[in-house]
Regions:
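A short, small-residue-rich loop immediately preceding and capping a beta-strand
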Residues: 41-55, 72, 189-195
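C-terminal structured "cap/appendage" subdomains that terminate the fold
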Residues: 160-194
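Short glycine/serine/threonine-rich phosphate/pyrophosphate-binding segments
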Residues: 48-59, 82-84, 171-178, 200-203
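Glycine/aspartate-rich loop-and-adjacent alpha/beta segment that forms the canonical ThDP
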Residues: 16-23, 193-213
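A glycine-rich, Thr/Ser-enriched phosphate-binding loop motif common to dinucleotide/cofactor-binding enzymes
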Residues: 12-28, 168-173
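Active-site/ligand-binding loops adjacent to catalytic centers
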Residues: 1-12, 16, 36, 64-69, ...
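Phosphate/pyrophosphate-binding loops at sites that engage ATP/ADP/AMP, CoA/4′-phosphopantetheine
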Residues: 29-39
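Buried hydrophobic packing segments
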Residues: 28, 58-62, 156, 174-181
């Protein structure tokens, strides 16, 4: 038996995990209609992507919408600025490979062996990604990018300063992308970021890097 905590691996595990996390987007849809009376015309849903379970759950109810109305943006772990290692197979040109019983984009060496990854976020430090996200990338339904460790830390500092949130380092990657693109957007664009984890699990890392938690 396998115990899988993300939308990775053989199809049945992807289905089970995807079914359970889809509740996130069901709730979001209700909240949007309550806030705006309808689904707004310009929405960007930004989520971090490691294995990809929270991103799929966040997007599930919106995948069939036109991407001009609902844009799906996944943010992978770009690793430290000065390192060549990362955990961003979708946004850094990884090739198709086999890992944990599934075909997906994987960080590999020239011989097809799985490469070492590096990220400040343990939750994003995975050398592959859900086959669902590979499909969304290939069909251009979702856009994938990455944030470096430094960008994620800066985003964490900004969010905790101005919002009543204490996000873990995983969603801090998503916040980093939101901060990067926000100044370029029209005023009627709705940005929604899934703050999918609490920083209490990263407190030792944050103390080491920022001197406080």
């Amino acid at each position: 038996h396998m115990c899988v905590g993300s939308t990775v691996g053989p199809n049945i595990f992807v289905k089970i995990c995807g079914w359970s996390t889809a509740q996130i987007s069901k709730e979001l849809k209700i909240q949007l209609k309550k806030e705006f009376k309808t689904i707004p015309n310009k929405v960007k849903l930004i989520n971090c992507v490691g294995g990809g379970s929270s991103a799929y759950g966040f997007w599930s109810e919106f995948i069939d919408y036109d991407k001009k109305q609902i844009e799906l943006i996944g943010v992978e772990a770009g690793g430290p600025k000065k390192s060549k290692l990362h955990a961003a197979p979708l946004s850094k040109g990884a090739k198709l490979g086999i890992l944990h019983g599934a075909a997906a984009y994987c960080c590999q060496d020239n011989e097809g062996q799985i490469k070492e990854t590096e990220s400040i976020s343990a939750g994003l430090d995975y050398p592959s990604v859900s086959p669902i996200h590979c499909f969304l990338k290939d069909t251009k339904r979702a856009r994938y990018t990455y944030a470096t460790d430094e960008a994620a830390l800066n985003a964490y500092k900004m969010v905790t300063k101005f919002e009543k949130l204490n996000p873990s380092l995983e969603p801090s990657h998503a916040f980093a992308e939101a901060i990067r693109i926000a100044p370029k957007l029209s005023k009627d664009t709705i940005l929604i970021i899934n703050s999918c984890g609490d920083a209490i699990k990263d407190r030792d890392i944050l103390k080491g890097r920022l001197g406080k938690y």
